[in-house]
């Protein structure tokens, strides 16, 4: 039984939201069944898990747009450090519906024509591919052979001043953990295939990360605000399994057993996050 349940989501349960709003229009705001409204709230998933497990402990949901999952992860780390519990279920999730896909495509977030996910990064154009997903982790402050990896450090930052500011924050983050970029076996970035946003990663790959093995992940899950949860799952399993899937590698060779992996992602160039994982 987890000692706490914490989730992060930017959109919440969109399918039920669309259903409820549609009924408001169709029924002229009269005689509306409340079920869809109740299930459309952002904390529905965390609440349903708690009800299923009969877990009456700390339960929280973070709705912080592009750093919703990281906020949940940070809250969990703080609870563990405070000794409130010794294991916490943490998850990041967002779903995509026909309605949300149509709206976000009109807003220019997604490409307006079909593109193979394996050709996402070679298709130089505006927009990315839509995605959705859910990834959950059981965090504990006790090391064991069952652990996938150790979450060494986490950092988020908002609207950096420019490329130099981003590089300073990354090097400062590593320095706080007594590391340099040369100590990192693999860097997983949130490259999305959108030329308006990938220039950040392009600049890093030729300057700060020029000697590092690089990997991408959004061609596997698509782009959505909490996709970093998928990246964390990918990184932790790469450390546990002592190998990196060839399908994610962009450049370089990785040690047979990567011991340190850095995950760097930004959403819309506004919300940035760094996650450092280490072998146990």
Language model features with spans:
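Conserved active-site "lid/cap" helical segment
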Residues: 1-6, 10-16, 72-75, 165-185, ...
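Conserved catalytic cysteine-centered active-site region
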Residues: 12-75, 107-128, 202-233
């Amino acid at each position: 039984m987890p000692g706490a349940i914490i989730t992060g989501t930017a959109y919440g349960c969109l399918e039920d939201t669309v259903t409820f709003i549609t009924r408001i229009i169709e029924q002229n705001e009269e005689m509306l069944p409340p079920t869809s409204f109740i299930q459309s709230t952002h904390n529905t998933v965390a609440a349903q898990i708690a009800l299923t497990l009969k877990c009456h402990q700390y339960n929280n949901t973070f709705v912080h747009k592009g750093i919703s999952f990281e906020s949940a992860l940070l809250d969990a780390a703080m609870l563990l450090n405070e000794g409130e519990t010794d294991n916490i279920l943490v998850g990041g999730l967002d779903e995509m519906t026909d309605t949300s896909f149509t709206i976000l495509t009109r807003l220019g977030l997604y490409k307006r024509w079909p593109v193979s996910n394996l050709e996402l990064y070679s298709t130089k154009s505006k927009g990315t591919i839509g995605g959705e997903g859910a990834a959950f982790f059981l965090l504990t402050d006790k090391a064991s052979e069952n652990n996938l990896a150790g979450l060494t450090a986490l950092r988020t930052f908002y609207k950096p001043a420019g490329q130099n500011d981003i590089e300073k924050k990354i090097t400062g983050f590593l320095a706080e953990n007594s590391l340099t970029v040369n100590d990192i076996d693999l860097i997983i970035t949130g490259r999305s295939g959108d030329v308006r946003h990938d220039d950040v990663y392009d600049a890093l790959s030729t300057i700060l990360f020029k000697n590092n093995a690089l990997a991408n992940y959004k061609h596997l899950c698509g782009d959505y605000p909490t996709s970093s949860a998928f990246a964390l799952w990918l990184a932790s399993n790469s450390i546990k399994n002592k190998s990196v899937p060839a399908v994610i590698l962009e450049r370089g060779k990785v040690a047979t057993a990567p011991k340190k992996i850095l995950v760097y992602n930004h959403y819309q160039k506004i919300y940035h996050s760094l996650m450092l994982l280490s072998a146990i």
